[in-house]
Amino acid sequence: MPDEVALIHQVGREHMPLADRSQVAYILLEASPTELMAQVRMPLNFALVLDHSGSMSKNQKLASVKEAVKMVIDHLSPADYISVVMFSGRANIIIPSMPARDPQGMKAAIERIKIGGGTNMARGMQAGLDELHRWSIPHAINRMILLTDGRTIASNKCRDLAKLAREFGIVIHPLGIGSDWDEGLLDEIGILSGGTEAEFIRTPTDAMSIFRQQVQSAMDVVVRNAILTLRLPIGVAPKRATRVLPTISDLGSSVLSDRQIVIPLGDLEKNNPPAVLIELLVEPRPAGLFRIAQAELSYDVPMIGLTGEKVRADIAVTFRSDAMQSSQLNPDVMNYVEKVNAHRLVSKVLDEYKRTGKTTTRLAPNVTRVLDSETQAALEQISQGQQISQEQVKVIGNKTRKLTQRLDYPG
């Protein structure tokens, strides 16, 4: 039995009531690298693709980003590779891809970066991909950090490049700084490349901590190409799949089929395992123990020569007539369910607001109670027909995606 990754599952209810109609069953699955993987460290192949258009001069944005890039350089080992590309109307390669063996020289090059003009992010992305391809680095974690503070021309080219990055195993992590960037485009770029939605750098002073998180995330990767598959028996149908950690994201219908759910998890980090929430529709069953899914995780650990390893788990519930037992819910699972429902409804409100400047969706108290006071206040303004700023829109979206990073329970 493989010991590199633990496939952990919990169900919303271990005991389900006998019923004459289909019922929803929730499954929470986590793919967690074990202690056996604690010492694994793969080389990094980083491309930092950064906006230095005129607007980056405001509020010390460029100055803060330059300091964050220097911090990244200091955190790398000589076995890691880094390149830095600045873009405005065109792309400039400040540091061509090379091992991080001369941190002082690299930081001096960063210090010399000046403000440019215009914003053509696609040119920066293309140059960044070229640098990531410059060397063949065995077992490297290929990452692009893409930062902008505004809107770009040639947005479709950016999407095409994100798809190309995924084909080559390069994950793009988009970062938006300030309040004027196109969150829809940056979110798409992240997802199309096999990553997640854009991270919001609310103030320039936040750049340091967010860049540090990005570096640590890459350093913590120990498992590659993880794919989670759930096979369902007759009488069980998939309803929805949602990533809940590290952030909330609806995985859409593309991962669902009649009797199977297939979710590409990608890289697994040793200190930040991903988790998904599965909703199933289970047809009526007689009393007894029934399997509702078989979960299988396949993965590679190239640093120790493992490919296509698999770990499996059978997931079962008991149907019974005892109303007391069948009413008992798993608080951890249901907390995730509550946060996912809140995220879904808040996202609907934001989508309506972006399209029409108002919303007809009303949020019930059981939704708003999991939101912080800033988010509640902004949503209340929208519900009353008032306008909120673009920064507030981005704050709400960013915070709501991260609701599951803390679990809390009603008192």
Where are these regions (language model features)?
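Exposed acidic/Ser/Thr-rich ligand/metal-binding surfaces
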Residues: 2, 8-225, 286-287, 369-374
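OB-fold and OB-like beta-barrel modules that bind single-stranded nucleic acids
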Residues: 28-30, 278-279, 295-297
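Solvent-exposed residues in well-ordered beta-strands and their adjoining turns
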Residues: 32-34, 231-233, 281-283, 300
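Short aromatic-acidic-glycine turn motif
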Residues: 95, 234-243, 302-306
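Extracellular adhesion/glycan-binding regions together with long Ser/Thr-
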Residues: 246-271
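Low-complexity, intrinsically disordered segments enriched in Ser/Thr together with acidic residues
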Residues: 269-288
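Long, acidic serine/threonine- and proline-rich intrinsically disordered regions
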Residues: 282-411
